[in-house]
A protein has these predicted regions:
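A mobile "lid/hinge" subdomain adjacent to the ATP/sugar-phosphate binding pocket shared
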Residues: 1-17
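Internal helix-turn-beta structural module
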Residues: 13-35, 39-43, 49-115
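Short, charge-rich patches within N-terminal targeting peptides
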Residues: 121-124
């Protein structure tokens, strides 16, 4: 995504790729909000969601009717809460360790525990 963002001013294909990524994310948020009957929180996580204020901004544009309104300064600073105060939907940025999660899931598969609740298994073995 960093490469696409850096190239989008001079490369229409890069600009289209970024625009489509954000559009599809907005579509998914809207679909989930419809199924859930609204939303009170939107969480950005992972590499792009955690580190790209530009992408968060572009995804959130057009979601104001769902109560999503970003605080530009908080978003740029990668604060834990990047929405304006008092809005209906709190927008959060949550740090993750994706590599650790992949490793844990891989270990569960290799140990034959795929699809089980790891915490429940850990409690039984304690």
């Amino acid at each position: 995504m960093r490469t696409l963002l850096a190239a989008r001013e001079r490369n229409p294909d890069a600009a289209l790729a970024v625009a489509m990524f954000c559009y599809r994310a907005r579509c998914e948020v809207g679909a989930l909000a419809a199924v859930l009957g609204g939303m009170d929180s939107l969480v950005f996580t992972g590499g792009i969601g955690e580190h790209s204020a530009v992408i968060r901004q572009e995804i959130c544009q057009g979601l104001e009717h769902l109560g999503v309104v970003l605080d530009t300064d908080a978003n740029t600073a990668h604060a834990p809460i990047v929405s304006r105060r008092g809005v209906a939907c709190v927008v959060r940025v949550v740090r993750t360790n994706e590599d650790l999660m992949v490793a844990r899931h891989t270990r569960a598969v290799l140990q034959g525990r795929a699809g089980t609740n790891d915490r429940r298994q850990q409690c039984k073995s304690a």
